[in-house]
Amino acid sequence: MRTAIIAGNWKMNKTVKEAVELVKELKPLVKDAKCDVVVCPTYVCLPAVLEEVKGSNIKVGAQNMHFEESGAYTGEIAPKMLEELGVHYVIIGHSERRQYFNETDETVNKKVKKAFEHNLIPIVCCGESLEEREGNITEKVLEGQIKVGLKELSKEQVEKLVIAYEPIWAIGTGKTATDEQANETIGYIRTVVKDMYGESVADKVRIQYGGSVKPGTIKAQMAKEEIDGALVGGASLKAKDFAAIVNY
C-alpha cells in the first residue's frame, strides 16, 4: 500500500515572516494527517520554515536545485546546501522551470541523480501542453520525459522518488482534467516506470496529481486507484485550504 503524499509548492510567494505564520497556523490543522505532508517554500524561507516545523509531522522541500556540487553558477543553489539545512524533498522539472528557465529532460535527470547523492527525495514533474494534448501525443510526450528523466537510476532510488503529473493544459486555461483522465494518465506513467524498472518498483512509486488541486476536488481525485497524492499550488498558500486538502 502506497502512503499518499501531499506537497504544497509555494512558488515565488511568502516572505520569511509570512512563511513562518503560515506554518504555525498549519501545524495543528494537519497533525493527524494520514498522508505525508510537505511544504516547499522559497530558498530564503527554508531555514525559518525548517525551524518552525521541528517536532511536527510536516516535512520541507525545496523548489529546485542545481546539478553541480558548487561553482560559477550565479543565483543557483547546490544540493549539499539543501542537505545541510535538513531539507527532505526537492521539486525537479516543474513545468514553470521547463517553460521559463530552459529545464530539459536531460537536466532533470542530472538533478535527480544528484538529489539522491545528497539524501534528497526528488519530486519529479512531468506533463503535456494543450497543443500536445490536442495533438493526441500525451503518451509519447510523457514517455519521453520519464524515460530520460528517470534513466540510469537504481531500483531502490526509483521506489523512493515521487512523480508529479501536471497537465500543463489544465493549469490556468479554464480547461480541467477529469478525475478519470488524471487517473488514466497517471496509470500510463506507472506503466512506463514498469517497462523501465519492473512491476514491483512501479507498484511502489508514488505519483501525484498537480493540475489546479483545490479542497473541493481532492476527495474524488484521491479516491482514484492510481493517484497517490497532490502537488498543490495556489491552495497551499492558505493554511485552512491546504489543511482541507491534506485531510481529504
Swiss-Prot record:
<feature type="binding site">
    <location>
        <begin position="9"/>
        <end position="11"/>
    </location>
    <ligand>
        <name>substrate</name>
    </ligand>
</feature>
<feature type="active site" description="Proton acceptor">
    <location>
        <position position="166"/>
    </location>
</feature>
<dbReference type="InterPro" id="IPR013785">
    <property type="entry name" value="Aldolase_TIM"/>
</dbReference>
<dbReference type="GO" id="GO:0006096">
    <property type="term" value="P:glycolytic process"/>
</dbReference>
<keyword id="KW-0312">Gluconeogenesis</keyword>
<protein>
    <recommendedName>
        <fullName>Triosephosphate isomerase</fullName>
        <ecNumber>5.3.1.1</ecNumber>
    </recommendedName>
</protein>
<feature type="binding site">
    <location>
        <position position="172"/>
    </location>
    <ligand>
        <name>substrate</name>
    </ligand>
</feature>
<dbReference type="GO" id="GO:0004807">
    <property type="term" value="F:triose-phosphate isomerase activity"/>
</dbReference>
<dbReference type="GO" id="GO:0019563">
    <property type="term" value="P:glycerol catabolic process"/>
</dbReference>
<feature type="binding site">
    <location>
        <begin position="233"/>
        <end position="234"/>
    </location>
    <ligand>
        <name>substrate</name>
    </ligand>
</feature>
<dbReference type="Pfam" id="PF00121">
    <property type="entry name" value="TIM"/>
</dbReference>
<keyword id="KW-0324">Glycolysis</keyword>
<dbReference type="InterPro" id="IPR035990">
    <property type="entry name" value="TIM_sf"/>
</dbReference>
<feature type="binding site">
    <location>
        <position position="212"/>
    </location>
    <ligand>
        <name>substrate</name>
    </ligand>
</feature>
<keyword id="KW-0413">Isomerase</keyword>
<keyword id="KW-0963">Cytoplasm</keyword>
<dbReference type="GO" id="GO:0046166">
    <property type="term" value="P:glyceraldehyde-3-phosphate biosynthetic process"/>
</dbReference>
<dbReference type="InterPro" id="IPR020861">
    <property type="entry name" value="Triosephosphate_isomerase_AS"/>
</dbReference>
<dbReference type="InterPro" id="IPR022896">
    <property type="entry name" value="TrioseP_Isoase_bac/euk"/>
</dbReference>
<dbReference type="GO" id="GO:0006094">
    <property type="term" value="P:gluconeogenesis"/>
</dbReference>
<feature type="active site" description="Electrophile">
    <location>
        <position position="94"/>
    </location>
</feature>
<comment type="subunit">
    <text>Homodimer.</text>
</comment>
<comment type="pathway">
    <text>Carbohydrate degradation; glycolysis; D-glyceraldehyde 3-phosphate from glycerone phosphate: step 1/1.</text>
</comment>
<comment type="similarity">
    <text>Belongs to the triosephosphate isomerase family.</text>
</comment>
<comment type="function">
    <text>Involved in the gluconeogenesis. Catalyzes stereospecifically the conversion of dihydroxyacetone phosphate (DHAP) to D-glyceraldehyde-3-phosphate (G3P).</text>
</comment>
<dbReference type="InterPro" id="IPR000652">
    <property type="entry name" value="Triosephosphate_isomerase"/>
</dbReference>
<comment type="pathway">
    <text>Carbohydrate biosynthesis; gluconeogenesis.</text>
</comment>
<dbReference type="GO" id="GO:0005829">
    <property type="term" value="C:cytosol"/>
</dbReference>
